């Protein structure tokens, strides 16, 4: 999958954002394409704020809850090993990727946002794992 295409999707919402492939804090075996660490935390111009509200690029951030669950799977591999896993609201795909790395038989990452699904595909490729993506869990 294309990191260039994902970068373009990020710039649609955050024109000054850029993706960096970095190891996840606390689970360095996983690398994710995330928004640059030095991205401004200051106020955004009104047009950018409107774009963020309309189509947030939440998939460009690795949420603490995702890191915590990925780390939990690493230390409790038996929860996913040999099983089928469905990751709902997958975002960046960290939990789906952790399930793959901990020997899940099949991992499906579900997110309603097509940009998040692209991020999951890109991040799975970065980590050399296979994740099925879908926008519908039914």
Which role does the model predict for each range below?
Residues 8-9, 45, 88, 112:
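Domain-scale activation on soluble regions of proteins
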Residues 40-44, 96-98:
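Short acidic/His/Gly/Ser-rich catalytic and metal-binding motifs that mark active-site loops
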Residues 46-55:
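Glycine/charged-rich beta-loop-alpha catalytic/anionic-binding loops adjacent to active sites
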Residues 56-74:
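Conserved SAM-binding loop and adjacent beta-strand
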Residues 70-137:
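Conserved SAM/SAH cofactor-binding pocket of Class I
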